[in-house]
């Protein structure tokens, strides 16, 4: 196809192939986010071939390629993606480590513009313009622009109550999602969520397409649990600056720009007094669900 529109976490994304550009073939995980809406928050034009970042652009961030093997993070390469700044423009330069083709891409974007450009080199006649890691990077910078929060967390909805379970890798996000799923709750996602303010004082958590069979899901956010494995189940209320710092520690953030960091800090600081938060030490069985529901 030459163009398509997506709605992911309420962000309206239009992707168009430029004149002479490649055919656009989004991966299966995005198909259920395709929509017919004509307006958009951001337009991304896709070009084939090489693009050269201005020579005097400053590299402001570099991300190595890290794989998780048996719960341990292992650096596989120093080269993955990087961010470069030239005047008011930003550039993401990336490789595609999961691709069968040896290709690379550059995304030109601005936090003050709704029109971005993407050049894919070595992709052939057909490309997925949202191939990993571009999907997460595009969504992250949309959260920055809109003052939202992207966080490492699983989320569920039980009887209308939305619970978010946040923690770094290995703390039990997926385990918690499975426990609730087995208890009949709706799992919003087990790994990554976007939290958006509703404009009327509340918050909604959204999933994003990560797995092949993902469908768009959202839930009002009722409580936040900062999780870790324990010998017994224990709920400890957290608030104030302690709550803000614990939530911030699990947020996805690029720390190269003080304004971006300040914006995220502001968003989390506004949310924490509104949404009750707890440290949750838990045993990986149904008893933790009983504890949470008992304290509802």
What do these predicted ranges mean?
Residues 1-164, 168-169, 179-186, 193-296:
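A noncatalytic interaction/capping subdomain that flanks phosphate/NTP-handling catalytic cores
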Residues 176:
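Hydrophobic positions on the alpha1 helix immediately C-terminal to the Walker A/P-loop
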Residues 171-173:
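Conserved glycine(s) of the Walker
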